[in-house]
């Protein structure tokens, strides 16, 4: 590993300070720090590197912040096989497991090849209208359908692999990966799922029917959700 990208929560002064120290640490070891453009402007260290270019150039991405910052980076590099080292400087640290005290020892291990990759599954989501896919996204944590601010309960007809599962009458529906099970799904009374498991969690948001509970399905399942009505 020679080129190390640095992405941080730019408006957090603590993250900026750690980033400056990290840049110096890398340069002292003859490594090339690739500073994300927004962070570079805050640190006044040149133009930096656009996020879209990080997957093509970096051997490792160091993320300084919380889970939200790491998830935004995962969307970029998830299908490029670029490892991410998450350092917890935020309020949530389910994904950013490395503490600040562990940052440099962890980096030394990565540079020497003494590390273990934790692979996480991602979820591909398509929005279909009139039989045409109009949007497609790949996400690390979850996909959420919710009602508008002034709307009432919505009916969500749900099928798995073409077989009718149920119609959720609720404020919305969450489809989460094991990684996303500790986020919005957990707040909606969904289960915590170990990240090594190959499954997806279907969690209704404030269901109107008590029997509408979270359901766990296989990771290779095709989940189809049709909005029946919106009042």
Spans of features found by a protein language model:
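ATP/NTP phosphate-donor binding region
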Residues: 1-60, 101-116, 127-137
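Redox-cofactor binding/interface segments in oxidoreductases and associated redox assembly factors
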Residues: 6, 63, 175
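Short glycine-rich anion-binding loops that position phosphate/pyrophosphate groups of nucleotides
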Residues: 11, 67-69, 92, 179-181
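Short glycine/serine/threonine-rich phosphate/pyrophosphate-binding segments
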Residues: 15, 68-74, 182-187
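Gly/Ser-rich helix-loop-strand patches that form or flank binding pockets
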Residues: 72, 77-87, 94
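Catalytic core of DAGKc-family lipid kinases
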Residues: 92-171
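ATP/nucleoside-binding phosphotransfer catalytic cores, i.e., glycine-rich phosphate-binding loops
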Residues: 145, 161-164, 210-231
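Gly/Ser/Thr-rich active-site loops/lids in small-molecule metabolic enzymes
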Residues: 166-211
């Amino acid at each position: 590993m020679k080129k190390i990208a640095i992405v941080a929560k730019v408006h957090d002064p603590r993250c900026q300070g750690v980033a400056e120290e990290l840049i110096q640490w890398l340069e002292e070891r003859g490594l090339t720090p690739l500073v994300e453009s927004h962070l570079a402007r805050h640190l006044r260290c040149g133009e930096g590197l656009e996020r879209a270019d990080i997957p093509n150039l970096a051997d490792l991405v160091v993320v300084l912040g919380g889970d939200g910052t790491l998830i935004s980076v995962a969307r970029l590099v998830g299908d490029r096989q670029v490892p991410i080292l998450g350092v917890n400087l935020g309020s949530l640290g389910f994904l950013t497991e490395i503490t600040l005290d562990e940052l440099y020892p962890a980096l030394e291990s990565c540079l020497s090849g003494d590390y273990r990759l934790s692979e996480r599954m991602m979820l591909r989501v398509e929005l279909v209208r009139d039989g045409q896919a109009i949007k497609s996204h790949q996400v690390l944590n979850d996909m959420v359908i919710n009602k508008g601010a002034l709307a009432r309960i919505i009916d969500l007809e749900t099928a798995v692999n073409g077989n009718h599962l149920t119609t959720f009458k609720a404020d919305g529906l969450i489809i989460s990966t094991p990684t996303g099970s500790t986020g919005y799904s957990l707040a909606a009374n969904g289960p915590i799922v170990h990240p090594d498991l190959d499954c997806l969690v279907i969690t209704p948001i404030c269901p109107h029917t008590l029997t509408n509970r979270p359901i766990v399905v296989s990771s290779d399942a095709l989940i189809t959700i049709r909005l029946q009505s919106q009042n």
